[in-house]
Amino acid sequence: MNPREIVQALLDSVQRGDFQKARFLVSKDCQFSGSVPESIQCEVWLRINKNLKKACPNLDYHFHVDRVDGLNGHLVKISAELKGTQSGVLDLSPVGLGLTPATDKSFATPCEHVKVTIKDGKVASWVVEPIEGAGLKAILRQLGVKLPTIV
């Protein structure tokens, strides 16, 4: 698969909730950053998304591959707008936030732009350009989830 096809396959797998296939498409040392306070391993990002998909069965990422750039086309730029309703328990223990009971509240994020780097036929990094009103914290605020404060 070429870089665009790899990224599209990952996006399609995440949207469908096929996280086994998604894991196959990311490298073992893949890093995710930008919409979370600190960089995390892509395995943690996949677990968060699996749990988000379970808690929000109608979750739609509105993924779109925008273009392919970089040396040999290994940088793929995508966009995403998440929308969903939390009708089930949301497990955020992969990032230390525990379980959140169903709120039956909806959320929608503005369009986020992402740079995905492909190396050796797998996703090596996923970097979200931070934007106000997007990311995990923004979703949790819209759901009415109280975030711990750090003193």
Predicted feature locations:
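C-terminal and inter-domain tail/linker signature
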Residues: M1-V151
